[in-house]
Amino acid sequence: MAIHFFNEESKYKLKLKSELKQWIKAVAAEEGFKIAALNYILCSDEYLHQINVTYLQHDTFTDIITFDHSEKKDSIAGDIFLSTDRVIENAQSFKVSESEEMCRVLVHGALHLMGYTDKTKASKSTMTTKENYYLAKRTFDGK
């Protein structure tokens, strides 16, 4: 059960790493999953854009890209790349703290590895409902 945080071309200082790891593990457990290996890579817009172009052939900016490496149905493993530039900008746009937006994106990536998608209006609504539910269950101050 390893969760790691890395920075690539980003100077973002992630706070409360231990609390975040416990929270993400609790989310996975409630969804019926164990975490095998989960890597969060905090990066710049440019870095994530290059990954988007290279691996997904999408020439757009995004806040998150998730690569699933899971080998078992009840276990998740993957690399989750997230743009700290997008997190900061989205926090301002949505009028929430950077911490809250970061938590939303972190759980969003984990939910992708648990099989949730956001490709349709209905699936996006389900995912947002899950995000809101788990954000409300945090036991640490990330707001």
Enumerate the predicted regions with their spans.
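Conserved ATP-binding N-box helix of the HATPase_c
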Residues: 111
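An acidic/histidine-cluster motif and surrounding catalytic segment
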Residues: 1-103, 114-143
